């Protein structure tokens, strides 16, 4: 299996690569500003990494989604998650509490992405933006939230597309490796 990590200038991108490589897959990291959309076909799954800024400041991520929806499995983390949420019509807003290097308990709905992960579990957060719950797109299902109902995980109802606001690649996230493994297996695990 060939995995593409689109690196959005984030220091965690190589932590992500290191974790994913542990599952006997080929992983290539390409900076978003260097990504040639014509090369995407050679990859089985795509991970949109964390990074600074707003989704609108990363048009390559939105172009990537345009090209691969329905053909590739996608996992967006932090910025990648926010891009997926806005791509399908959701709005993002500034967090009431900025979460940089803070952990929170995450509850989940038992989706296959959370296979073998306790409910709740502790995860590391580095973000100042969140998905607005006032306009969740019809095609999006919320699969994880904090105890005060801040969106932490989403999936597309039809396609193999997931987003996580928290950081599974952080050592501060319990079961982060299991989450990434579950993403690699998403087409093989039944819900």
Where are these regions (language model features)?
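Cysteine-nucleophile active-site neighborhood
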Residues: 43-116, 122, 180-182
């Amino acid at each position: 299996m060939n995995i593409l990590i689109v690196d959005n200038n984030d220091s965690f991108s190589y932590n992500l690569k290191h974790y994913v490589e542990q599952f006997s897959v080929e992983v290539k990291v390409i900076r978003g500003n260097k990504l040639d959309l014509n090369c995407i076909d050679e990859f089985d799954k795509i991970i949109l990494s964390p990074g600074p800024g707003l989704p609108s400041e990363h048009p390559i991520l939105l172009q990537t989604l345009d090209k691969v929806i329905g053909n590739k499995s996608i996992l967006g983390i932090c910025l990648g998650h926010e891009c997926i949420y806005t791509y399908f019509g959701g709005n993002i807003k500034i967090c009431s509490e900025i979460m940089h290097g803070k952990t929170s308990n995450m509850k989940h709905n038992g989706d296959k992405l959370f296979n073998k992960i306790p409910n709740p579990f502790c995860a590391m957060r580095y973000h100042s933006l969140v998905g607005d719950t006032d306009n969740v797109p019809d095609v999006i299902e919320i699969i994880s939230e904090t105890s005060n109902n801040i969106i932490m995980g989403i999936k597309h109802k039809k396609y193999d597309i997931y987003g996580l606001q928290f950081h599974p690649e952080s050592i501060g996230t319990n079961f982060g490796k299991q989450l990434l493994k579950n993403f690699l297996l998403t087409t093989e695990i039944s819900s």
